[in-house]
Design a protein with these regions (language model features):
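N-terminal secretory signal peptides that target proteins for export/translocation
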Residues: 1-7
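Low-complexity, Gly/Pro
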Residues: 2, 26, 39, 63, ...
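Short, well-ordered turn and helix-capping elements at secondary-structure junctions
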Residues: 5, 91, 107-111
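Bacterial N-terminal signal peptides
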Residues: 10-22
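Short, low-complexity N-terminal intrinsically disordered segments enriched in polar/charged residues
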Residues: 24-53
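Short solvent-exposed beta->alpha transition segments
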Residues: 25-26, 42-44, 57-102
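Sec-exported extracytoplasmic/periplasmic mature domains
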Residues: 49-53, 57, 62-69, 108-111, ...
């Protein structure tokens, strides 16, 4: 190998290494959302959903919109005998202004009174004020009342 070929190869490897490290340092590039609000929403939504899935409703309540917290907690306390076995979350639908989002989550659960698994859907409507990254949820459950009534 000639010195010129070796220098060209070394230069190419150096450029590749610099570009790779630069990509790691700066993370994902999102030109449509430079403040990275979508990531914060995804994380808040995931944490809330996991807390509900593990019946930690007191902690999940921290993510609920202020004027819905008490109603949420009262509804969820009725699930004290429910055992969640899993959940499936659809992708987040974020509006153009990036201040509102909707997510549908399907939980799988059972109760001692119903020894078979049933699915209950939750529609999570997330919102935030301005460019703040504090997302709050208002949730609506479909099929929850029938489960609690049994």
């Amino acid at each position: 190998m000639t010195i010129h070929a070796f220098r060209t190869l070394a230069f190419g490897l150096l450029i590749t290494a610099v570009l790779s490290l630069g990509g790691c340092a700066f993370g994902e590039f999102r030109p449509s959302d430079p403040f990275d609000r979508q990531y914060t929403l995804d994380e808040a939504q995931h944490r809330y959903t996991v807390l509900v899935r593990f019946s930690d409703f007191q902690k999940a309540r921290k993510f609920v919109a202020e004027d819905h917290k008490e109603g949420f907690y009262q509804r969820m306390r009725a699930l004290k005998d429910v055992h969640f076995t899993g959940y499936d979350s659809e992708s987040v639908e974020l509006d153009e202004e990036k201040t509102k989002a909707t997510v549908r989550v399907t939980y799988t659960m059972y109760t001692p009174a119903l020894p078979y698994e049933v699915e209950v859907s939750e529609v999570q409507e997330w919102s935030r004020d301005g460019i703040a990254n504090t997302w709050r949820v208002v949730s609506t459950f479909e099929g929850l009342q029938q489960l609690v009534a049994n």
